[in-house]
Structures are given as structure tokens and as C-alpha cells.
Amino acid sequence: MQVQKSFKDKKTSGTLYLVPTPIGNLQDMTFRAVATLKEVDFICAEDTRNTGLLLKHFDIATKQISFHEHNSYEKIPDLIDLLISGRSLAQVSDAGMPSISDPGHDLVKAAIDSDIAVVALPGASAGITALIASGLAPQPHVFYGFLPRKAGQQKAFFEDKHHYTETQMFCESPYRIKDTLTNMLACYGDRQVVLVRELTKLFEEYQRGSISEILSYLEETPLKGECLLIVAGAQVDSEIELTADVDLVSLVQKEIQAGAKPNQAIKTIAKAYQVNRQELYQQFHDL
């Protein structure tokens, strides 16, 4: 067990700060984020050119270290050594929260394993920002990040998730969005979705409707800009209707194959299909 007192413990090691950056509007940069980036010894940036423009705008002279998904494995030991020596680092992504669909998690884990304080600053996050204005249920929700690009893998992903009752969020390219929605329609049915593009920018847009309605709209209005896709969770109208043609035990076995423990898998499927957990437990163990 580890207990971190972020601002009270005086250690000889430095601190790793996770600093969010604007997702499109520079006015969303917080005072605390600017102050932190000025005070740390180094800034670990996903793209030093992109971050360089941000630093110039806010008159921040702190030196950058390139840190992205292609060099993180070799960079992390050196960054941990800097932290252990007493240097403080800030980690930023190109936009939004570090570690969310961006590099950072492995560095955080390595810092924690080395008993180095990790402090996250609040700020811009595309997923939460889009969700609360979407009109779909904000909780429970799950954010999956970027979808598989290959059609077969994407369809398998949707088949595995179509029964989830949570609101689901995905990142997607404007060049793939129509194919993605077509695959989703085949697996999820024509449920409600919200397509969000150019979040916080001048041309911010929310497209709200059924999957088929959004597809029809996109045929007439080509999409530009990176987008977020928010999908309503599966609706449970009747336990009998929902489970009549579903092999719940097989779904439990799939959850276990994916790494879940048996009891957790049973709980997940029972909740998703609104069936009695004890009855499903008995069915599973009677096999």
C-alpha cells in the first residue's frame, strides 16, 4: 500500500505534474497550468513543436523533452532518474488531459513505483466536455478512446459492447466516421448518438439524432475536423425480451476470457441484462 500526501510530504525527489492543455481554445488554459509549466524544471511534450507554440503564447521558457508513444519506452528511465534527483517535470499532451488517449500512463506508473509524487491538475478534457452537453445520460459512462481501424476488428468490438447500458464515448477520424456508424448500426441498432466536432473551436458542432439520421446528414454534409462519438447505452425494456435469445453464460465466459474474474464477470453480465445475479451464478456453475 502507498499513501501520497501531494503537498505535505517533503521529499528529496521531484514531482511529476500532469498538466492539461486547451483542446481548441487558448482561453481554457488555467492560471495554475501556466504557473506550473513555468515552475517545473522540464516539460515532457508529445509534440515539442505544437507545445512550443503554446509555451510561446503564455511566455513560458521552460525547456522541453520530447516524450511520445514511439520513444516512451526508452525515455521513461531517464525521466525517472531526473525525478529521483530532485527535478520536477510536467507532462503535457497535444490537447487535453495527459494519459487520456495520449501517452503518459506508463510514466505515471513508473513514477508511482519509484515512490515519486504524481499530481494531476484539473482542466480541459474533450470527453467530459462533450458528454455533459450531449443530452445523453452522463452517468454511468465509459470512454474507449480510438476505435479499431480494421472493419472486422471494429465489428467484433461493437458486438462485444452492444449490450452495455452505459453511455459510450469514442474518438474517430472524419474520414472513417461513416464506415464506423454503418458498422455500429449493424451491431447496436438505430439508437441515439451525438457526433461532436471542433470542440471549443469557432465551428463547434453537435449533431444529435439516431445513427441512421446522422448517416443521412453526413451524406449531404461532409464532416471536417476530429470528432467525438457519444452513443446511448442499450435500453432494457423487458428482462424476458432482452434475454430470450441471449446466451448469458457464454457472455460470462467471454468476460472471463478477456481477463475478468468469474464473480466479476457474472456481476457485469447480470447488471447489463438486468437479471438476478444469484440465478446467473447458479446457471454458470451448474455447467
UniProtKB/Swiss-Prot annotation:
Main location: cytoplasm
Keyword line: Cytoplasm, Methyltransferase, rRNA processing, S-adenosyl-L-methionine, Transferase
HAMAP family: 16SrRNA_methyltr_I
Protein name: Ribosomal RNA small subunit methyltransferase I
Enzyme kind, highest EC tier: transferase
Gene label: rsmI
Organism in which the protein naturally occurs: Streptococcus pyogenes serotype M6 (strain ATCC BAA-946 / MGAS10394)
EC number: 2.1.1.198
Highest taxon of the lineage: Bacteria
GO MF term set: rRNA (cytosine-2'-O-)-methyltransferase activity
Sequence similarity: Belongs to the methyltransferase superfamily. RsmI family.
Spans through the membrane: none
GO CC term, one of those recorded: cytoplasm
Subcellular location: Cytoplasm
PANTHER family: RIBOSOMAL RNA SMALL SUBUNIT METHYLTRANSFERASE I (PTHR46111:SF1)
Catalytic activity reported: cytidine(1402) in 16S rRNA + S-adenosyl-L-methionine = 2'-O-methylcytidine(1402) in 16S rRNA + S-adenosyl-L-homocysteine + H(+)
Purpose of the protein: Catalyzes the 2'-O-methylation of the ribose of cytidine 1402 (C1402) in 16S rRNA.
